[in-house]
UniProtKB/Swiss-Prot annotation:
Cofactor(s) this protein requires: FAD
Function, in words: Catalyzes the oxidation of hydrogen sulfide, with the help of a quinone.
Annotated S-S bridges: C204-C380
Name listed for the protein in its UniProt record: Sulfide:quinone oxidoreductase, mitochondrial
Top EC class for this record: oxidoreductase
Single GO BP term: sulfide oxidation, using sulfide:quinone oxidoreductase
Active site per the UniProt annotation: C204, C380
Residues that coordinate or bind FAD: A54, G55, E77, Q85, V120, D337, K345, T346, A347, A348
One Pfam family here: Pyr_redox_2
InterPro entries: FAD/NAD-bd_sf (IPR036188), FAD/NAD-binding_dom (IPR023753), Sulphide_quinone_reductase (IPR015904)
The protein's Enzyme Commission number: 1.8.5.8
Cofactor binding, per record: Binds 1 FAD per subunit.
Organism: Dictyostelium discoideum (Social amoeba)
Single GO molecular function: sulfide:quinone oxidoreductase activity
Amino acid sequence: MFKSIMYALAVAPAVTSSSDKLPNGVVSASQLGSEKEKRKLKNVTKIVIVGGGAGGLSVASQLEHKFKNKGDIVIVEPSEKHYYQPLWTLVGGGIFSRKDSEKDEKDFIPKGATWVKDSVTVFKPEENIVLTKDGKEIDYDYLVVSTGLELYWDRVKGLKENLGKNGVTSNYSYDSCEKTFEFIKSLKPGNVAIFTVPTTGVKCGGAPQKILWLCDDYLRKHGIRDKVRLDFNSAGASMFPVKKYSEVLDKMAKERGVNQNFAHNLVEIKGDSKEAVFETPQGNKTVKYDMIHVVPPMGPHSVIKNSPLADPATGFVNVDKGTLQHVKYDNVFSLGDTSNLPTSKTAAAITSQAPILVGNLINHKLGLPLNHKYDGYTSCPITTSYSKIILAEFKYGFEVDESLPFDQSKESYFPMFLKKYVFPTAYWEGMLKGRWFGKNTLFNPIKTPEIN
């Protein structure tokens, strides 16, 4: 695997920016008909990708490789910066600077794509049109939606105004992830540190406890672990949704003296008095803290939730869990955090989803069956110390699906090496360029023809 990774980085071509390209994917309403006719005559397919994060850029790059000059790829994304968010755990542990997680979005827009620096406000799938905040009307032949999750900071009273001060921090924010390590270093004998998990699904189900274990290890290395109370307050019912890993983490918590408080949902932060209020089955419970790491509630963006694309039950884009095609609109696809796929929302999941989505979109274009199926594969490297990781890999039904030749529920040095030195490079130089396929490394498991 490692040799394959190094080879990939050596041969990967440079990405050329298209940030100065005119937005030829944007037309007025009166031009829509003529533009469609021109594309039809030239056999050009227009694909609009809403969202320029991990999912959107992965799909855009893979589509560019397949469509060559027969694809008009438009990426609608307002942000000028792109973040490798899995690194924020290690930033919170003092291993990296937050600047190591940040690059310019323009450097990852495929050279054949058009970047519309805007955000979509309305989806009109019946008309094959999206409307943007700046008043643009963009038509498409195919639509890919990958807008990610919205973090609901305001759903915990007092959280927004206290974030980054009064001992309140979160590795889910670029603005506060460096504060996490500052607060860990400030812990003293007699202090209490709390780590929370909300009622909603989150980005990477194991991330809320990664910083707990780094804090535990840091305090041990500095000889005060037995004098600082660590509480894991989760709105859930277990340490992890996959039984095999949850049992190991539960045992670890008991051995390391971590207090586990399940069915504890954070509802309020009182920064001035350093108190946290939790909703429990027995009523609200107020706890004093010196440091609290908060994972905010998360969910679909309102533009998705209120659109015809949404699953009424979840608010996420309603797709077939195998093909990633929308259940109603056959020219609409979705992947990653914004989809209603019943699996953990991680970058690793996207590495498996993207080639399947691209393969099925091409099959649909060619009038072929959508025979590529996503099995729910996802992965979560759970940092258990500064040197070791439990590498959780599983698929639909929380079925274990490990890829390394050892029991991955055991703490290991090798996955930490991957997380620190391989995965970031694979993300920037492979995944976003459409040349990294997760557990399949360089080898795209989906074989589809190029469109000429």
